[in-house]
Amino acid sequence: MNDKALRTEALSVGLEPPSFKDLLIPIPNSGTKKKNKKKKKPKAKKNVETQANVDLLGSAGTDSAVTDVGANNGVIDHQASLELSNLNSRISHPQLVSANGDDSSLINVEGISSTDWQFTLESDDTIEHSPQCILSTSSFVDEAEFPVHIPGLEDATSSNMSPNSVQNNMNLNTVALGSSTSSKRKKKKKKKSKANSASLNVDDQRDFEQVYSTDVAITYRNGQALSYYNGSVRQASMNNNVNNNKSKDIWSSSNTEEREQIREFWLSLSESERRSLVKVEKEAVLQKMKEQQKYSCSCSVCGRKRLAIEEELEVLYDAYYEELEQYANIQRNLANTESVNASDEGSDKSQKGIISDSPKLLSIPLNNVPSKSLNDDITQDELNSSNADVDEEVIETTSLEEKNVDNQEFVTSISNGNQTLEDTSHSPQTQPPFQPPYPSKADEKNSYHSDLYNFGSSLTVKGGILTVADDLLKNDGKKFIEMMEQLAERRMQREDNSNFHEPELYESGLEYDEDEEEDEEDVDEDELDLMTDEQRMEEGRRMFQIFAARLFEQRVLQAYREKVAQQRQAKLLEEIEEENKRKQERELKKIREKEKKRDKKKQLKLAKEEERQRREAERLAEQAAQKALEAKRQEEARKKREEQRLKREQEKKQQELERQKREEKQKQKEREKKLKKQQQEADREKMAREQRLREEEEKRILEERKRREKLDKEEEERRRRELLEKESEEKERRLREAKIAAFFAPNQTKEGSDGCTTSSQLGLFEKKGDLVNDEDKLSSHLLDSVPNALRQAPIGLKNTNNLSERNASSNLLNSSLFSSFNSVNPLISLEPNPLNRTLNNSVNLTDFGRKPNGLHSPSSLLSNSNNFGLNPNARHSLSRANSPVHHYPFATPPSQRANKYPLNNGANVPALLNSFSSPQLSPLVNRVLNEPSSSPLSSSSLKSPLSKEGVLNQQGHEQYNFSLSPSIRNKLSPICRPSQGSSPKLKNNLSNTEERMGSRALLDDKTDSVITASNSTTSGLSRDESSNPNNYELLNAFNQNTWKISRSTSNKSLIPESPWGVALGAFTPNASTQSIPWGNRTWTD
């Protein structure tokens, strides 16, 4: 059946195999008309040459991947160190996770190179690790070369050529891919250079192949493999027996043992691990292939050629992947139907059915059946190397496919793989070699081609991922490993054939002449022209098969190397640990030995010490016995001596007691004598002291008596003198009052008041004669009119007048004479002080009109500016209680206090005894008014404004002082402090008032002195001596409290000797309390 029939059958099944006809660049048919002379002989020679070159190429490509590991142990150790470093880097970077989500990672391949295109997958940070990119960085750089059968490029496999020369050769020979052909002369030179390079490097290629085979034997020998699973390194261990038997061969192994170790390693892997090793992704491989071209020539010609090659390769990859993917779909459908049928028959039959179905799946006809020309050029070495290459790149890509499409089939194949392990390993009939449906005659003659075809037929694509058929991975993967071994055996045969034909090549090359070369060129051109599209498609498939085989092999080798490195690392750690343990054991042994020696020495020392102690104890016992005997003898002697001593002491004590008794008696007698003498002396001193005291007492009494007498005399003289002074003052005051009363008498009669002055009194003032005689008469007349009871009453009760006198005094201020006073000085106020109201309510003699001492602040002068603050109808306007600067409070009205305290004779005392009314003006006032020039009220003096000031007269009472001019007085009298003998209650009130009103600040302690009774004849405040009292007659006339009380020497004076007591009418709190008889009652002061 030809290709057309195969396409028809594929279309009937539902497949549409792609054709490469439109994808490849057409080759010029310039040589089609030439004759095919000498075709067979040159062609046979050419086949032999190309076969040898391809064999050397495959061996060189795969050998370059393992040049780091030699046959000797030194090379193996070096490779082990590289593997350990790679393992540590991968463990520290667990980000390489497959894209299908099953957390299975892969073992990366970094170097896949070809002699024609230099495919080297190396570490490159420019490649992004996309979910579909499975190729990543690794420390292993394995170069797997892929020689595609393109005439004219076989001799580019020389390892001594530089990358630029290889690239130039590749670019010059792109005729097979559709580029324009060169002249025959250029082809001759090119082929000669290739043949020479191939012949010169045969020995080098052998050496590479020798190293590769040795390295494969070493690598395939050791026990375990590493696969990345769930983001961590998973160690797939073999059987314990295998590990125990082969652990001694880890550090050294032979070529014969490595194959067995590789086989055991592959069989020890699970199905999922084997599946992960045979997966590769198309895009990553193409990307690496393109990146490799960056290191070639960068000229425009080479760049165009390189782009053409890359595009052609991509077209070939795409077409082949599409065919394989369609074939994989057919396999999957058949496998699903067979698995359903097998499940009905039971577990045992299902296992056999799966095994028997494997050849059926592989026997499906494909359009990618390799042709004879393709099979002739495939070598065993290339397939072995491609095995390892494919293994690494297929891991994650298949996992993507399985996740989306064939997840169930993947799980079923894993579960069934272990069950069919033993059956397939012991039944070769279940693994018949796969033959193409229509093999050619060359394939029937050569079993190697059938093996390669079986491998190519086993490749499949799932979701753009190249992998191997499932039956090669099941049954412990024996099919796959057996196929790899068969390909390796074919490689060995090819090596023998190449060695056998090598002399012929050199001979044939020497015998050729130019004509033969030209004929050969013509034949080659004819062969190129005769290549059909099917051959080009088969060439592309062949390239993919070689690539997959080498990649799979490289994957397995690298996994095995990592497992060996892991084992070596573990073994090294174990040896180190064992060495440490041995060291510790040796040290412990030494320590134990030292301890034993020390114990023995201690025991010897203890024995010697015990012996010494025993001897010492015996010696001490003997000494103790001797000491006891000696002590006994000494004790007896001591007792004897003690008895004798006691006897002597007893005698001495007796004698001492007798002596003490005699001395005590003598001392007693002496003490008695001394006491008697002391008693006599004390009596004499006592009598003398008493006598002296009596004399001193008598003397003191005499002196006290004399002092008292002197004081009494002085007191009597003082009282007498004061009485005389007071009488004279009283006379003067009465005279002034009489003058004032005479002065205001006319106004008083006009207003209809009850005046007390008689016509005889008024007549006395009409004359302008001697004022003194008139005043004396008037004062004597006024004194006669005072009742005797009032004269004997206290001072506070003497100041009583008729209401007519009060009205007269009030009318005096309201008269036209003082109208100027009222208008000029609005500051004068006669309001009572609140303190006086408080004192007026006390339950003592203030009810009789007694006023406490003390001054009040003149701050009340600021109010009641009109008419001195008086109501014209007020009856007590000029009384002492209404004075703004007076210290007396308002008196109680007469209606409330009349007949309150009766006198001794039964007469009622007026209630307002202490409210002093203004008397009638004396003739002195008239004289002053009639004589303006001599009176202080002259016209010249009236020009200045009047001011009302509270001043004190000679008796210390307040009076009204109408100051007409500042020149009238040189200095105001200072306000003195109260006496120290004032009562506490009034003293506190007055002191608070003084502090508030500022009376303390008005006294200058340095310049002003308080006039007392002892140093001044006048009581009250001090005044300037230069001022004439006569100038103040009119002002003194306003002083109303002029009643005095006569004192008797027999009775203690009620008036205190302090200046305030005299000034305030003797009613001060410091006055001694006396009981004064007053009618039927007693007045207590």
Curated annotation (Swiss-Prot):
GO CC terms in record: cytoplasm; cytosol; P-body
Q: Does the keyword Phosphoprotein apply?
A: yes
Q: Which UniProt keywords apply?
A: Coiled coil, Cytoplasm, Phosphoprotein, Stress response
Q: Where is this region: Disordered?
A: 22-52, 176-200, 418-446, 492-526, 577-731, 877-900, 927-950, 971-996
The family database entries (Pfam families) matched by this protein are listed as: NST1 (PF13945)
Q: What spans are recorded as compositionally biased (Low complexity)? A: 932-948
Q: Which family does it belong to?
A: Belongs to the NST1 family.
What is the name listed in the Swiss-Prot or TrEMBL entry for this protein? Stress response protein nst1
| Natural source organism | Schizosaccharomyces pombe (strain 972 / ATCC 24843)
Q: Which gene encodes it?
A: nst1
